[in-house]
Each structure stands twice: as C-alpha cells, then as structure tokens.
Amino acid sequence: AIEQKKTEKVQIEKDKNLKETSLEKLKLKEQQLSAQLKEDERKKQELKRKVDVAIREEINKAKQREINRQKEKQRKKEEAKKGKSTQNTKTKNVKNDVAVNTKKVVTAESSEGSATGKNFANNKGRLPWPVNNGQITERYGRNSHPTLPGVSTVNNGIDITCSSGSKVRAVFEGEVSSVFSIPGSGKVVIIKHGGYMTVYSNLQEVYVSQGSKVSLKQSVGSLVNEGGVSSCHFEIHLISNGLPETLNPSLWLGGR
C-alpha cells in the first residue's frame, strides 16, 4: 500500500508538471496570437489610412475637373455672347453650326462618367471574383477572432484565401487611380469605375500603373506567398456627394 501511494504521488506530480507545462505553452500561444493580432490591426489601419488618402485625392481631382469643366463651359458661353454682339453679320447657318458643336462637346464630357457608374451599379451581385479560386476567410464588418475569446476585428472588405501566388484581376473595367505599398503587407491597386472604386491589396507584383485603363477580368497583379497560401484583401467604395462609403463586397460578387 505504501509503495502504491508513492507511485500515485509520483504520477500526481507528473500530471501537475504536465498541466503547468501545457498552461505555459497556452499562455505563450495566446501572447503570440495577441502580438500577431496587433500587427494585423496595424497593417489594417495603415491600409485604411492610405486608401482614405487615395480616395480623397481622387474626389478632389474629380471636383477640380468639374470646376474646370464649368469654367470652360462659362468661357465658351461668354465667347458665344461676345461673338453674337460683334459679329451679327454672320449667317443663321453659321450660328447653328456653333450651337451644334458646343452641344456636342458638353454631351461628350458629361455622359462618360455617368454611364460608367451606372453600368457598375447595375452589375451588383454579378461581378466576377477578384481571384479565380479561393474561399472567403474573413467577411465584411465585425468578425470574431477564431481562437481568442471575446476578441473581434472590423474588416472594410473581405479576405479571400487562395492558392499561393494567385493572380488578382479587375472585377470591372475602369482606370487605375492609385498604386502604393504597405510595409509588411505588399502592394495595393485602386481602380475607379465612375462613382465606385475597388481596392486590391496584399500584392507581391503589380502589372498596371496609375492612369492605366483596365478591362474586365484583366490581371492587375499577383499575391504575396504566405506559407504555401495567399490572401487577397478586396474592398468596394462608393463615392456619393463627395463622401466615400464602404460597401459589402459579398453582395456585389457573383460567379467566378
């Protein structure tokens, strides 16, 4: 009986040491996860900051273009009035030609942007995925952390985990508005589609440059390799009344 109690005591000590070791490993893992979470959050905030700056710059450019267009329109209007007062000997046909030409210029300038924005909006729920394969691993909005209880993160877009080095493609035709880098998080491409803008980040290589015209499903870059897999971060923004608004990409994407 004494020997049995000694054996039980030894076993209890082993179990106790094992539990303490497991607890230490668990604490260490939690610390590592917390550190990784902080780093991921830092990258998200840096991405958000740079995307906000890029979109704000695009909004300011659009405002300036509209101001310039209005100035040009006013200048032509004043020139037309001056021409009427100083050259009233012109024939009716010549006056009609001037009016027709002016009307054509105004129509060409005002129709392009609205047509592009309207087409993008009409494709809600039918846009192709930004990658050819993959699974959504973090959705738009607030997400609970998979291992840390009570911890959640906020996502301005969606994260799609896919094959290592996968190509990223434009979900709609448009023009490249910005290309920039995030330290430790690859490169970012922003494409404007009229009143909408799409964001593609975590890129290793970029195949387009600012001002480039892109077509539907055109490759814009390849993803960073993250231990045998890659993750594509994708966002959609709507510019309304000069203010940006994030949209849920899952509601816009359809088939691949």
Regions found by a protein language model. Give the residues of each.
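Short, well-structured beta-strand-loop connectors
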Residues: E8, V168-E175, V208-S222
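Long, low-complexity, acidic/serine-threonine-proline-glutamine-glycine-rich intrinsically disordered tracts
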Residues: I67-N132, E138, R142
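Zn2+-dependent peptidoglycan hydrolase active-site motif and core
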Residues: T153, A170-E205
